[in-house]
Amino acid sequence: WEKWTDKETKEFQDQFIQWYEQEKRNLPWRYNRDPYRIWISEIMLQQTRVDTVIDYFYRFMEWFPTIEELANAPEEKLLKAWEGLGYYSRARNIQAAAKQIMSEFDGKMPQTPEEISSLKGIGPYTTGAIASIAFGLPEPAVDGNVMRVVSRLFCIEADIAKASSRKIFDEAMRKIIDEKHPGEFNQAMMDLGSAICTPTSPKCETCPIQAFCLANKRGIQTSFPVKTKKAKPKDVYYISAALQNHSGAYYFEERDSQKLLANMWTFPMMEVTQEEYERLLSLIHI
C-alpha cells in the first residue's frame, strides 16, 4: 500500500465499490444507516454466522426497538432474546452500553470513534463499523476476514495472531479506504472475506480486486495470512443432575456470574476431573 500511487488507489476503490453495489448481500441491518441496528448486528455477528443472526436480529429489534427500551429491559427478557446465540456476556455488555448511552449521551448513539469506543463491549472493529456505516467516517473496521484480505492484497507477513500486528493492518486500511464511501468499503471487505477471499480455496477467479492482489500475482494466496497456531484447548468436564419432585417439577439453579453459562438457569452442575467423569459414564445407574 505504501507503493500505490493515488491513481492506483482510486482505481482500486472504484472497482471495489462498484462490485459491492452489484453483489452486496441483502441483510436486514443494511436497510438503513440506523446506528442502533448496525451496533446490535455487529455484536451479534461476533462468533456467529450471518444466516443464524438474521432471525435473532429481527426478534431483538421487535422486543427492544429503541436504545431506551433496551436499557430499561429486565435482564431475564434480554437473555431470553439472546438465548441460542451463546457468549451471553455480549448481551450484558449491550445493555450496559445502552444504559451508558442514556446517561452520558442523552439517549443518542455517540458519533465520534472516541466516544463510540468508550461504550461497554465495543472494540476497534465495531467502532470502525458503526463510525463508517452509520456516520460516514473513514474509520477502518479490521477483523480476521479483513486482515486475511489485506494480507493477501499486499503480501503482509505480520502474524495476525499477535495483537501488535493490528496496527499494520489498520494503517493499510486507512491508506486504501474510500473516504467518500467508507461504510460501503468496509462492508465490501466483509463480504469479500466471507464469500470469496476465504481461508482455504479462495475463489480468486471471481475476485473483483484480483488484478491488484500481490499474492494472486505471485500464486501464493494460501500462504497468507501468517498465523501462529493457538495452544490446544483444555478439556473441562461437568456432570449435571436432573432433580424432579413428586409433583413433576424440576429443580433449576442460577449459575454464578463468573462461571460457565454465567447467570443462566440450568440443572445443577459440578465440575469434575476426567477420571471422575469417565468413572461416572461407566455406571448404568447413579
How should each PLM-predicted stretch be described?
Residues 179, 183, 201, 232-235, ...:
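Alpha-helix initiation and capping sites
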Residues 269-280:
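N-terminal phosphate-binding loop and adjacent alpha-helix
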Residues 222-269:
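N-terminal strand-loop-strand
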Residues 33, 86, 134, 233, ...:
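Structured beta->alpha junctions
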Residues 12-13, 22, 234, 260:
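A generic structural signal for short, non-catalytic loop/turn and secondary-structure boundary residues
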Residues 284-286:
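Conserved small/polar residues in nucleotide/adenosyl-binding loops
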Residues 213-214, 257-260, 274:
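Short, catalytically relevant binding-site loops at active-site mouths
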Residues 1-8, 15, 19-203, 209-218, ...:
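Catalytic cores of DNA base-excision repair glycosylases
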